[in-house]
Amino acid sequence: MSEKTFLVEIGTEELPPKALRSLAESFAANFTAELDNAGLAHGNVEWFAAPRRLALKVANLAESQPDREVEKRGPAIAQAFDAEGKPSKAAEGWARGCGITVDQAERLKTDKGEWLLYRAHVKGESTEALVPNMVVTSLAKLPIPKLMRWGASDVHFVRPVHTVTLLLGDKVIPATILGIQSDRVIRGHRFMGEPEFTIDSAEQYPQILLERGKVIADYEARKAKIKADAEEAARKIGGNADLSESLLEEVASLVEWPVVLTAKFEEKFLAVPAEALVYTMKGDQKYFPVYDNAGKLLPNFIFVANIESKDPTQIISGNEKVVRPRLADAEFFFNTDRKKRLEDHLPRLQTVLFQQQLGTLRDKTDRIQALAGWIAGQIGADVNHATRAGLLSKCDLMTNMVFEFTDTQGVMGMHYARHDGEAEDVAVALNEQYQPRFAGDDLPSNPVACALAIADKMDTLAGIFGIGQHPKGDKDPFALRRAALGVLRIIVEKNLNLDLQTLTEEAARLYGDKLTNANVVDDVIDFMLGRFRAWYQDEGYTVDTIQAVLARRPTRPADFDARMKAVSHFRTLEEASALAAANKRVSNILAKATEPLNDIVHASVLKEAAEIELARHLVVLRDKLQPYFADGRYQEALIELAALRAPVDEFFENVMVNAEEKDIRINRLTLLSKLRELFLQVADISLLQ
């Protein structure tokens, strides 16, 4: 069977830069699945993405599906014909479905009887016939939140489509996709190269687009070029470019022919906090800031043009003129804001609503102030500083700088607090209260900041759950999942002695009578334990390990983490599977027991050597392990409990639990309950698979 290279390119208006990669990757994944489902043999599926195109190139694509033999078994002969030998309705219906008559059917004889049988040799469909619908289906499944239509057409796509190139080898596959007739026409760069040209074969892509169209269609190659050229440009001016992955991806999605240039701004702007300057350079202008080797911002920036200019100084000058007013605004806001103390903004917080039922930002500030102080007392942080940080926590939201550059919230609070002479840990806490903002983000660096960050998040969790507006499906407008995971990460990774039960109770208490959900505390804790499940799964822990710990519902996150590590280690022990099975057996036996058990195991009632030996081990371990449990040394405890494998095996091998004599039976059930209680001090290992 012959194989050819296949190419599909969808030429569009400028695609959303932040979605470009996901669109291309989804297109490739969808189309690959279509090929596999159709049984079309193929080689590597390579995707290409640039601002005005999505493309796929498939190596070694078979020109048709393989032929296949089809067999369909029909009714048994006894049901296929009546007493007179005439075909039954069932037989005729089956034959019609196969496209034959009953007389044309073969017969299949087996040891179990005889059936009608249809056999056919089905010729595989051509790739040319199959591919158009595959492309249409793959495009329809792209993750596009909002479609648009253009002109008089009722076709919908993420952006207007101008060209559809569909080639199998050197042949155009005729099709109409997104309202456009397929062809071999490709559009080049808007201002460089050839604006439009034809491609002779799929093999020529993307090289022909590079040479004639001045477009680097390979997304990763374009991104790598920007990164390398920006690093070199920064090195030439004695600095290091801030090439954050997200901005690098966005810029790579904005240009077809990247040209890296260096520009500068007045040094006077460096008196403004670097974060504000960086925010406007990266967020508004898509520029890469440059730092010296000490990490200090330089009065330079790197940007990427989408054209090779005969006079690059004009482009550089233009970008400098664009950024200058933005930096001047930041300078003005900074100087204006410093004329007031942070504390002076407190009254204005009363004018901003946090949530309709939960009050204003000033109300939230008062709660955070109290809760941060309470948390500080629990974890050994400075209570006065935590309380002060809570009071000032939202004041920077009322400043000109944060109003204009919203992402500088927190960090500007820190700078203004330092200007006001606040304690350093208070100032730092104002910046770090929102950490961690995302998975893998840094945690607050000092105890006061930890107290404030936890207080802010717990206040939101208690409040929103308290009015019954918990997250549903993908909707989480108050980012409660992120808040819950942030609290857990801080407590676990900083090893803070906090209990979710008392923490949530205190957060809910501070709302007074505003909360309508009587189960708010349990609901918040259950939600946070659910976040634990997701976190540990991401960390590579098995589901049954997580379930074993969750069954005990530990509400101290640091304690939960210690149990997780202990059970995970226990699973590696040779005795683990046998003891897990034994615990499951014990759990089932106790669940079926209907008689009340004894408080203790009565040694005088023990008869068999195996039960006497098991009881002896339990007494020794119970006394030995109490300090382990009290100190959270769960891993050591489970290692000790692993020694019970032999006596437990002996017990089940030689002892009849449900003895006829009631006192013996109840004593043995009590013995098993004591065994189970020891393991349950750590986790329910009966849930381990």
Curated annotation (Swiss-Prot):
GO biological process terms held by the UniProt record: arginyl-tRNA aminoacylation; glycyl-tRNA aminoacylation
PROSITE patterns: AA_TRNA_LIGASE_II_GLYAB
The protein's enzyme class: ligase
Top-level lineage group: Bacteria
GO cellular-component term (any): cytosol
Record EC number: 6.1.1.14
Keyword field: Aminoacyl-tRNA synthetase, ATP-binding, Cytoplasm, Ligase, Nucleotide-binding, Protein biosynthesis
Chief location of this protein within or outside the cell: cytoplasm
Keyword Protease: no
Official protein name in the record: Glycine--tRNA ligase beta subunit
Subunit-structure text: Tetramer of two alpha and two beta subunits.
Taxonomic source organism: Salmonella paratyphi A (strain AKU_12601)
Any GO MF annotation of the entry: ATP binding
Catalytic activity: tRNA(Gly) + glycine + ATP = glycyl-tRNA(Gly) + AMP + diphosphate
Membership in a protein family: Belongs to the class-II aminoacyl-tRNA synthetase family.
Location in or out of the cell: Cytoplasm
Pfam families (alphabetical): DALR_1, tRNA_synt_2f
Keyword Cytoplasm: yes
